[in-house]
Amino acid sequence: MLEIIKRLEYYAKVQPQSIALQIDDEIVNYENLYQKICDCTLNSPKFKLGCRVALLNDSPIVNITNYFVVLMMDGVPCFLDNKWSRDTIDKLIEHFHIEYVMTAIGKFKRTTSFGTYEKYISEQLKVDDLLHIGFTSGTTGLPKAYYRNEPSWIASYVENEKLIYNYEKALAAPGPLAHSLSLYTCIYALYSGRTFIGQRQFDAKRFISILNEQHSNIALFLVPTMLHQLLNVDTTITHIKSIFCSGAKLSESLFKTVSQQFKNANIIEFFGTSEASFITYNFNQTSPTNSVGQVFPNVSIKLEAQDNRKIGLLKVQSNMIYSGYVDVGVVQPHSWIETGDYAYIQNNQLYLVSRKSDRLIIGGKNIYPNVIEQQVKSLDGIEEAVVVGEPHRRFGEIAVLIYVGNQELDYTTLRRYLRQTLSRYEIPSKLVRVKDLPFTNSGKVARNTVQTLYLEGAFKV
């Protein structure tokens, strides 16, 4: 039996009336949650060990209850995002051999993949203590499915706990449970006997109101885009003690604003991926400006194919990594995995320079967009910046800066500023100011979408 199931049973006995889940105005205590899970398990049809079951309901409480029902029955829950198109959901069910779907509490419905058990079970059984199958939030193509086992998340909880200093009894994440960060937070809360606070759909004003009603200290887990929306709500909440932010680095100006509005909170920025889990942390921006933070003590770093500036492809090893992509092969604990980032490291601080797929080659030289973007975002009045490539006959491609800000950048002034730290090949050839930029579900700028829009002429130069 998984440790999380044992813990739910324990908390149902020793703190039965403690709130386990609060989603908007809906509240469930530990006793009722565990009893509902047990009742549904007893009344559900039996299936084979490791059978894959999709969770697809509008209610997070229904989904998380079904999550544990599937685990109690030795199945594998697969969290699907109900905001995906019907076509995407059908393709995922078929491609990854998901045999059942649960659209209501305790109710199983066979899918078109029913009977495909033998096609996937041999690989899946190589994963010890499998918790669920998650899906990446890619901007193009079908989301990738990956295995997440329980020991890797328990290891993450251990490291997370070291960064919580104020006895936070509630963990809040307003994002969908289909997203790794919110599901992680929910299971973390239940594993540690805390209250999980979430929402059906993110509403900054309503979320702040719910947090205001709490009587215990709170730790928030969210992405920068959501944090930015919370700042637009007038509030003086004093019992938010920790803000864990993942997905993209906070600009200095945004960090300052967050610090002023949530005066009693420590702000911890994580860098990591769905596959690698946590890699680095930046506590109250005490790390160097362009760094994504200090490497976690249980994470090892390796940089491959380094250039003369010691920039290389980032690989990580830890007890927090995933167990591999579905249908690609199982990754054993403590294996080295590639993140797809170019990076360098100094004094145990990690510096990202580009995604592998984002690197530009201008005049035969490797140019890393993130380096340019960080310099631009350090300017007053610049909210967001992304550098994309445009084909060029002479140089192969040139860099184009697309930015959001309350001021128009003067090219000559910007060039003079950037030349202090960047080479001439890294200076963007064109500047484009836009009102806003598209983001992924994980809170990152949708770079591929931005490049496509630019090349199609959607942005005016």
From Swiss-Prot:
Q: Which UniProt keywords apply?
A: Fatty acid metabolism, Ligase, Lipid metabolism
Q: Gene3D superfamilies, per this entry?
A: 3.30.300.30, N-terminal domain of ligase-like (3.40.50.12780)
InterPro entries given in the database record: AMP-bd_C (IPR025110), AMP-bd_C_sf (IPR045851), AMP-binding_CS (IPR020845), AMP-dep_synth/lig_dom (IPR000873), ANL_N_sf (IPR042099)
CDD domains registered for this protein in UniProt: AFD_YhfT-like
Q: Which leading EC class covers this enzyme?
A: ligase
Q: EC? A: 6.2.1.-
Biological process (GO) annotations? fatty acid metabolic process
| Keyword presence, Lipid metabolism | yes
Q: GO MF terms on file?
A: medium-chain fatty acid-CoA ligase activity
Q: Which family does the similarity line name? A: Belongs to the ATP-dependent AMP-binding enzyme family.
Q: Which PANTHER family match?
A: ACYL-COA SYNTHETASE, MEDIUM-CHAIN ACYL-COA LIGASE ACSF2, MITOCHONDRIAL
| Official protein name in the record | Putative long chain fatty acid-CoA ligase VraA
